[in-house]
Amino acid sequence: MAAAAVGGRGERLSSSSPTAAAPQVDAGKYVRYTPEQVEALERVYTECPKPSSLRRQQLIRECPILSNIEPKQIKVWFQNRRCREKQRKEASRLQTVNRKLNAMNKLLMEENDRLQKQVSRLVYENGYMRTQLHNPSAATTDTSCESVVTSGQHHQQQNPAVLHPQRDANNPAGLLAIAEETLAEFMSKATGTAVEWVQMVGMKPGPDSIGIIAVSHNCSGVAARACGLVSLEPTKVAEILKDRPSWYRDCRCVDIIHVIPTGNGGTIELIYMQTYAPTTLAAPRDFWTLRYTSGLEDGSLVICERSLTQSTGGPSGPNTPNFIRAEVLPSGYLIRPCEGGGSMIYIVDHVDLDAWSVPEVLRPLYESPKILAQKMTIAALRHIRQIAHESSGEIPYGAGRQPAVFRTFSQRLSRGFNDAVSGFPDDGWSLLSSDGSEDITISVNSSPNKLVGSHVSPNPLFSTVGGGILCAKASMLLQNVPPALLVRFLREHRSEWADPGVDAYSAASLRASPYAVPGLRTSGFMGSQVILPLAHTLEHEEFLEVIRLEGHGFSHDEVLLSRDMYLLQLCSGVDENATSASAQLVFAPIDESFADDAPLLPSGFRVIPLDTKMDGPSATRTLDLASALEVGPGGASRASVEASGTCNRSVLTIAFQFSYENHLRESVAAMARSYVRAVMASVQRVAVAIAPSRLGPQIGMKHPPASPEALTLASWIGRSYRAHTGADIRWSDTEDADSPLALLWKHSDAILCCSLKPAPMFTFANNAGLDILETTLVNLQDISLEMILDDEGRKALCSEFPKIMQQGFTYLPGGVCKSSMGRQASYEQAVAWKVLSDDDAPHCLAFMLVNWTFM
């Protein structure tokens, strides 16, 4: 027994039944295994942690070394082994959480120390102000800078404009002096009180939170600060942060002009960066900066950056036409290693975007530190956390692809849309001739392969015939529409604004023989859209998906041409409860193969809230106080409306790209201009419909709508039925004979109305109609006519559709329809008639399903 126990492992039996393997049993309680036996069992455990009874018996036969152990004992060994593995994982998880909590506790203690210093400074300034107020004579005679009442604010806003002698790239000592000054100023912002930071609402620390986010208050330019924990080593974090185009979506390019090593092991880089313009109404920005990377004595890594200007000294950077030079004030990243692995990151972004150079209505985009925080500071932290999460292996692969592939797709969609909005000449874009009065800008690119890139497969259209890319874009202001709500509606209700013919043209551009010009195929209609999710970010603020548009047609030719179409779509900023710099919906047609190197031609929408600047000086706050006293609709003050998260104004940017053949360029341009104008009108109509002021607390309840539009529609339905059939609708209840809407609502037969569009969507239903569709008035607009009809119903409608349009009505045979929940319902007969408005113009199509019942 002693020989069997040497180097072995003891396993407690689940029962005390006697066993024949006496050498492995210790007092009937433990079974001891030799190292060779444990090694054999571990090999099997690696292959199959939970073997079946047959597998365990086979194991005993295959391994003679296990022949003296009963199958029941081996079963107990595997049970205990699984328990040990589970305990090991749980212990590891708890250790990780404990390390995070310890690091977060250290972070909070440092934040507390910094806030205490800030409070002490404010108390001192407050006491000084009181002294000045009680001694006005001293305030008038003392002309020193400390006598200014707003000394604290003055101190914050004043940038020391110390003129240094001109220092160029040939003088490393001069650049090192600038770098050391930048490092000191950055550290005073990251861990000191050089900037008065105000924590953003909703950003609370915790082991799984993104970190502590704060924005500047009363300082020159706009600034944002973040500190958080990530499970990556400092060198990896630094590598990610330096690759700015991978996480900063507004970054067009970063060119490192010159690299100078320093004596302390660091590096100085001279960098030229270009950023995209957020809308078509503003010019893009560029930056000429010095970036300094160095290590600190405590093992931390610092990457700091600032613009090289006349006041700082240093060489002059490149000047690019059509760009406005903006300034980076001392900013950067402080990366500290954590005990047990991981890093603690401090991020400071401080810029002056020259807000006075843009139209006044757009200045909030350049004056809001919250927008800067969302676009840069939080984006950097989220990207690092996303990569750390992917590196842990906890994210399952979707569609057979690694997460990095989906990140690349998202970056390509976003970058392609930004390229379309900005239309840089060095990418091949040029303006098409216009009379100057157009609200829609048309640009063409005759070098599409340069724009698409050499890393993707060439488009067959560009390789077979001469052609290019045409972009139609526009921007407009919206009132009282939350960007998240609008973009979510555009995503979920594509049929409300999209033209199936244009979608078909875009999809055909992926094939060698595209349609000539869309606009002629209007009799067919597009079926429902199916959303196939692909990937999403860690906090679900952005997601990638494939949209399948099911194609159908009425005529024989359209059936041959129609086919399912696919869009790769990127959606972000649609959570109304989260703070976001913008809401965006970008999509590009793809084919069924969905190759990694497929060319993408993105189009889409971007909605940016125009929030008023909340961090201005005291004079601005006085104006804000006055405006807060203004009472808006419903008796609510404007301040209370803004505090509730409602966006009063936003700017919408639309850009649609189309490929074209050279001889059809003018035709495609006319189509694109007309289409974008129609989309803008649809979006404006949707914005009015979904504005919060129009959404009451009763929305979604099944009750007859009492709006004037509903009353008018009810009278049109009854009058049109009488005009076409020569008889009135047989009302099941005459109690409300004076109210056509009430009669229509209470009718026992299902009465449904759908739009006269290529893709008919339901616009109205009575109570019975909502019952048969198993939906509500709000969700009714999600349902298309195509979705509820079976094959026989579609054939009957297609054959009778010309009769409806000519004679005004028709009777359809009984059949079966499908509810939104997938349940089938039968009806004895259906009546379809054309609803005419007061001027006898076709308004919609009405259906009455007689004597319906669920099957």
Curated annotation (Swiss-Prot):
MF GO annotations: DNA binding; DNA-binding transcription factor activity; lipid binding
Highest taxon listed in the record's lineage: Eukaryota
Keyword Membrane: no
DNA-binding region per UniProt: 26-89
Pfam families: Homeodomain, MEKHLA, START
Xref: InterPro entries: HD, HD-Zip_III, Homeodomain-like_sf, MEKHLA, START-like_dom_sf, START_lipid-bd_dom
Role, per record: Probable transcription factor.
PANTHER family: HOMEOBOX-LEUCINE ZIPPER PROTEIN ATHB-14, HOMEOBOX-LEUCINE ZIPPER PROTEIN HOX33
Record's protein name: Homeobox-leucine zipper protein HOX33
Organism (species): Oryza sativa subsp. indica (Rice)
